[in-house]
Amino acid sequence: MQVMYALLKPGGTMICSDFHPFTKIADILNLEQPSMSYFSTAVFEGEMAHARFYEDSVRQQMPRCSYRKYTISEIINAVINNKFILKRFDEHPAWDNPDVPGEFTITADR
């Protein structure tokens, strides 16, 4: 969030949209990622984002990445603690199961 705040012009609006941390406890979006405790702070190794959308020959050449999945409160508090003015927080249904959150969007001003 520090980098986004530094890059955004004063008076500008940040729109952050990402997978909902709820996906930590179940692979509800079929992202081929391991499930873990919602509150886990573990770092794990996996494929780059969206690698599964490439052909296997390309996918195998992509470097592995380290991930740490944050809780929704960690994400929202990072927005607030980095001087953004939180304007809106929305949760969106998962693609395959509209009964659970799959993505979120945060809108905040600098």
Predicted regions mapped to residue ranges:
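Bulky hydrophobic/aromatic packing residues
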Residues: 1-4, 67-68, 95
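A short hydrophobic/small-residue beta-strand
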Residues: 14-15, 86
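SAM-dependent methyltransferase
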Residues: 15-77
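Acidic/proline-rich low-complexity IDRs
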Residues: 6-7, 61, 85
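C-terminal lobe and adjacent flexible extensions of AdoMet/dcAdoMet transferase-like proteins
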Residues: 74-110
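A short glycine-rich, Lys/Arg-flanked "PGG" loop and its adjoining helix->strand segment in the class I
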Residues: 1-13
